Amino acid sequence: MAIDMKAIHDSTHTLVMGVLNITEDSSSDGGLWLDPAKAKAHGEAMMKAGADIIDIGAESTRPGAKRVSEEDEQTRVLGAVDALISEGAVLSIDTTRASVARMALEHGAQIINDVSGGRMDREVPHVVAEHAESLYIVQHWRGWLAGSAGDVPDADTSVYANGVVDDVYDELMKQVDDVLQAGVSPSQIIIDPGLGFSKPSVEHNFPLMVALERFNATGYPVLIGASRKRFVGAALADAGIDEPDMDSKDNATAAISALCAEHGAWAVRVHDVEKSRDAVAIGNAWRAFAND
């Protein structure tokens, strides 16, 4: 099945990216899809539920998570890529390693989702540049504690002297400049403000989502990844919902998905595809009539 990546990149409606964590320790679903057969079945189920893209990650980025070996990450990713590419899936690979990115692209993956935005392994942008038809998600990133795959800061990286929106915008644009210098084409780039990464609170994350149109104005498509993050649960708790469970967080994520679709996000990255699929459909319709 031929994939029109230009159409994926330049979509006029918000896409749904389903999360496939083939990890032992992801915060919400660690261990559930580690078995290759279960990973394939879950990926296929998300496609059937309406996911436009499947985002495969073999290393947890939760706070405090320990890194998996390069060999283990490669093995997990390759198994999932080979299993799903034959089903016509558009595959995004959540990795910070150049070796994993190269292997996945050579086996048919189309998107590299680098939560470090090219900072953890400086070769990743070069690998993307070598694959001119691929896309590269550049996420805002302030650094991790050595030896950890999660956003555990060396110092207090959650302080934004000029306000979270201005600082994240400026820092993310600097990351984009560095990626361009590495040879990545502007047409390959998607940006992500990195919700939850060095942004622990409601006060950090909601202003970034409210400022979505400012990020859209860069001309780069924008990915929003709010699904099941702690600030979503905190917002529910602030509204008087005690100890919100996963279903509550998925409902809240769907509300965020609808709002982000209405305001022109390129895609939303979610765990519960079905709920956000319906929410995004309403947001897309709202946007279409608002712009009519």
Q: Which residue stretches match the model-derived regions?
A:
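Catalytic domains of carbohydrate-active enzymes, especially glycoside hydrolases
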Residues: A41-G57, H263
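Short acidic capping loops at alpha-helix termini that bridge into adjacent secondary structure
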Residues: S185-Q188
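Active-site-adjacent loop and "lid" segments of alpha/beta metabolic enzymes
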Residues: I3-M5, D10-S11, S27-A41, T61-G79, ...
